[in-house]
A protein has these predicted regions:
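Bacterial N-terminal signal peptides
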Residues: 4-15
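S-adenosyl-L-methionine
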Residues: 21-61, 91-124
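Conserved class I S-adenosyl-L-methionine
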Residues: 59-69
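Conserved SAM-binding loop of SAM-dependent methyltransferases across substrates and taxa
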Residues: 70-82
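Conserved SAM-binding motif I beta-strand of class I
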Residues: 83-88
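A short SAM/SAH-binding and catalytic strip from SAM-dependent methyltransferases
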Residues: 122-139
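C-terminal substrate-binding/active-site "lid" region of AdoMet-derived donor-dependent transferases
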Residues: 135-160
Length: 160
């Protein structure tokens, strides 16, 4: 009986520590997990590099990734010296992206915010990258058309 009580006590006392460890690390995102407007599917790094090349991203740019997920496009732009901003609705993905930027040493150039891309001002961007479905691209069209002339927009896979 004492052993059972001791085991039960040990298990109960260890739970707060386990919960604290979980709270410190964001959960690993799953490909295909549903989000507010779309499912999360990460863009391969090689394709991100091609998108940034196509936009001719330099250190003089302000890059915005709409639906930034785990932050890989923002981090890649920051590694090129650009000031890069990720707008992502999923708070866990924002935490993952922020941790990834810190791990890659670009936290000073890569920022992430939990926000609705349809209600957030990103008009100061010189480059916009996105990987969204066509209906979302169409919904974003008015915001993008109101951006400054010369703003480069690169959409992965789907037309604007």
């Amino acid at each position: 009986m004492r052993l059972a009580t001791a085991v039960c006590l040990a298990i109960c006392l260890s739970q707060p520590a386990a919960l604290a460890q979980t709270a410190q690390r964001p959960a690993k995102p799953l490909v295909g997990q549903p989000g507010k407007d779309a499912i999360w599917v990460p863009t391969p790094s090689a394709l991100i590099e091609m998108m940034l090349d196509l936009a001719k991203v330099t250190a003089a740019d302000r890059v915005v990734d709409l639906g930034s997920g785990d932050g890989r496009a923002v981090i890649a732009a920051a590694k090129r010296g650009a000031n890069a901003r990720g707008i992502e609705f999923d708070a866990n993905l924002v935490a993952v992206a922020t941790a990834n930027a810190a791990k890659e040493g670009v936290s000073d150039k890569a920022t992430f915010e939990r926000a609705d891309m349809f209600a957030t001002d990103f008009s100061n961007a010189t480059v916009v990258v996105l990987f969204l479905l066509p209906d979302l691209n169409i919904k974003l069209r008015p915001s993008i058309l109101n951006m400054k002339p010369g703003t480069r927009v690169v959409s992965n896979t789907f037309e604007m």
